[in-house]
Amino acid sequence: WPWQQVMDVVSLLALAGGLLLAATVPDGPHLPRAARLQWRALGALWTHRPVRASAFGYFGHMWELYTFWVLVPAIVGTRLAGAPASAAAFAVIALGTLGCVAGGLLVRRVGSARVANAQLATSGLCCLLAPWMLHAPDLAFALWLAVWGTTVVGDSPQFSTLTAQNAPREAVGSLLTLVNSIGFAVSIVSIQLFAMLAARFDLATLLPWLAVGPVLGLWMMRG
């Protein structure tokens, strides 16, 4: 199908799901009154070291994640074309599910910070290996993309968990909202920048710069 039709169908399904939820799932009797967004909660990013660490770790992760997903079809396209390329790109992105599940299970043993750091470091290493892996044998190329696709997203819930755990109790909701919003703003900048640069540079030159996010994120998480 053309991508426009896919987007139309997915949008209609999302709309139908929202309407179904609104029509069939009422608010419970103990629903608290909605709190107002507290902009001053942003101050915790500078005054509260654990919040600053997890938030900036998340920002670094968001620099890489969505831009990688945007570039996956181009990366796969260096080896495959047509339907096989589409299927392979889907598989690489879908492997992130395993990273999230595995990370959630490991948290019980080693904690969210270690899981987040390990996955961010692994995906960052995959960025830096790009100039060599793009020309590697097919099996090595496939394993590289599989590892990258698995680890690039698995740290996301861990950073959110750490921010929620470390945030002041009275501002958890506001801080999560603001941190997520900033994170997606970082993604927009990253996507636009790399899309522009992709017209001038090849993937071997471009992909290592995705590691800027993981490197900065790990540096902020060091404390």
Q: Where on the chain are the PLM-derived regions?
A:
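Helix-to-loop junctions at the C-terminal end of transmembrane segments
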Residues: 99-112, 198-199
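C-terminal membrane-cytosol helix-exit motif in multi-pass small-molecule transporters
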Residues: 12-31, 218-223
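A membrane-interface helix-boundary motif in multi-pass transporters
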Residues: 1-11, 82-84, 193-214
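C-terminal transmembrane helical hairpin of 12-TM major facilitator-type secondary transporters
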Residues: 111-162
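Extracytoplasmic gate region of multi-pass secondary transporters
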Residues: 50-101
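A late C-terminal transmembrane helix in Major Facilitator Superfamily
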Residues: 164-201
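Transmembrane alpha-helical cores of Major Facilitator Superfamily
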Residues: 59, 90, 94, 121, ...
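Juxtamembrane intracellular "pre-TM" segments in multi-pass secondary transporters
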Residues: 25-56
